[in-house]
Amino acid sequence: MVQDRKVLDALDTAKTQWYHFTAVVIAGMGFFTDAYDLFSISLVTKLLGRIYYFNPASKSPGSLPPNVSAAVNGVAFCGTLAGQLFFGWLGDKMGRKKVYGMTLMLMVICCLASGLSFGSSAKGVMATLCFFRFWLGFGIGGDYPLSATIMSEYANKRTRGAFIAAVFAMQGFGNLTGGIVAIIVSAAFKLRFDAPAYRDDRAGSTVPQADYAWRIVLMFGAIPALLTYYWRMKMPETARYTALVAKNDKKAAADMARVLNVELVDEQEKAAAATAAAAEEEAARREQYGLFSREFARRHGHHLLGTTVCWFVLDIAYYSQNLFQKDIYTAVQWLPKADTMSALEEMFKISRAQTLVALCGTIPGYWFTVLFIDIVGRFAIQLGGFFLMTAFMLGLAVPYHHWTTPGNHVGFVVMYAFTFFFANFGPNSTTFIVPAEIFPARLRSTCHGISSAAGKMGAIVGSFGFLYAAQSTDPSKTDAGYPRGIGVRNSLFLLAGCNVVGFLFTFLVPESKGKSLEELSGENEMEAEPAAATNSYRQTVPDSGQSE
């Protein structure tokens, strides 16, 4: 239908404006909160073990039993997976805006509830913590398809990749803030309630007030989400959803007039009657295939396979490293042995290590993607990222014993940081961006939800599997309660193999740089464009300014 074609053309050629940047902040703050909530748990798991699983007869500080640790670390991912599928589907059925506020409020409530976890026993506290973190993950899951879809549908085609990447890049600041908050909280508590090392005083090394420290860290995640709730509710529905799915061209153009300087003119009213028949015919053609149809499989089946597999294997590698950075640091002696520190000191040093990696390896990679994705393209960045991640992981794994010898620990951390850099300046960003671009509008949120859910399945495999796989091959050196594993070195080989799989499946995903969403999804092929309405719309800014 020509009206929505004109709406979409106006969106694709619209000049980059202030509202685009506002949308990045509004959508990006959700990802800031997402990253903070998902990664902050790794900063406090050692502290949880010391508080709730203390054994005065043990020579080592208390630690979470394997099943409890797996649940605490992985339950939010289970919720995220479910949320991605549910809210992705709901975003296509009800509209992006209507669902957007639900996810944010769920995140706020469950952030606060996680910090208020209660119970008369250690199991009780862990059970309530896991319950609230599951629903926290459920809300976080909804943010993935909705934020990506909203940003892709607002942006013009020349800078669309950079804007979606900027939304995702807020994860880096979420990680960094998680580390900074944990550093401040642990340092403040340590200053006020200093304690001896565990080997000097087993019971006294964990002060009772430490039970407040982890709660404060988890609850802080509610603040940025709460601050952006009002602005999310003020965002209009995306014009692409209104025009292509709700089929209300007049409202789509009116919404654009509010935020993107594009308005409806009287001629549209005159053209509406003349194009009604064409609109009905086109609508019927658009609805001729659904997600599970042969036509979808023919047009987009290989695309969906590529996006899901790439995100799945990427998250196995990415999240297993992120969640267990502290274990790798300990293995190379970058962190002191646990019994030489008090509980709060251990939390401080774990947080400091994660903050350093976020600052040096994580954040730069995200913003390199923002700068180069509309120049180099999605395909090249993803392919190169998988290749270099493989190379650096093999560089860590092959001479692993060299890296663990005295004097080489800094080199290990540098290599490890480069692995994160090329994950973020690579597939960790592009696997989020591409599914928001290549599928039809009526299935865009659903397909992004499916792709991101595959990623979270990989995160579950990484977070649960790595707990066991990375244990030492020497039974005497495993963590309490864990069976013998394959060791960190062999685990790195496995993760490198995952990256090779991602490299190969990248070839199923099309390049989307510089193309309109309708061109990528094939919706252009199904459009009838009556000549009578070619001038239905006009832009309020001069044509000469629409070069971005």
UniProtKB/Swiss-Prot annotation:
Keyword Acetylation: no
Primary residence: membrane
Name of this chain's protein: Probable inorganic phosphate transporter 1-5
Record-level GO cellular component terms: membrane
Protein induction: Not induced in roots by phosphate starvation.
GO terms classed as biological process: phosphate ion transport
Membership in a protein family: Belongs to the major facilitator superfamily. Phosphate:H(+) symporter (TC 2.A.1.9) family.
Residue spans, topological domain Extracellular: 45-69, 120-123, 185-210, 325-355, 400-405, 471-490
PANTHER family associated with the record: SOLUTE CARRIER FAMILY 22 MEMBER
Purpose of the protein: High-affinity transporter for external inorganic phosphate.
Chain ranges on the Cytoplasmic side, renumbered to this chain: 1-23, 91-98, 145-163, 232-303, 377-378, 427-449, 512-548
UniProt keyword terms in alphabetical order: Membrane, Phosphate transport, Symport, Transmembrane, Transmembrane helix, Transport
Transmembrane segments: 24-44, 70-90, 99-119, 124-144, 164-184, 211-231, 304-324, 356-376, 379-399, 406-426, 450-470, 491-511
Cleaved signal peptide residues: none
UniProt keyword annotation of Ribosomal protein present: no
Biased composition (Polar residues): 533-548
Naturally occurring in which organism (per UniProt): Oryza sativa subsp. japonica
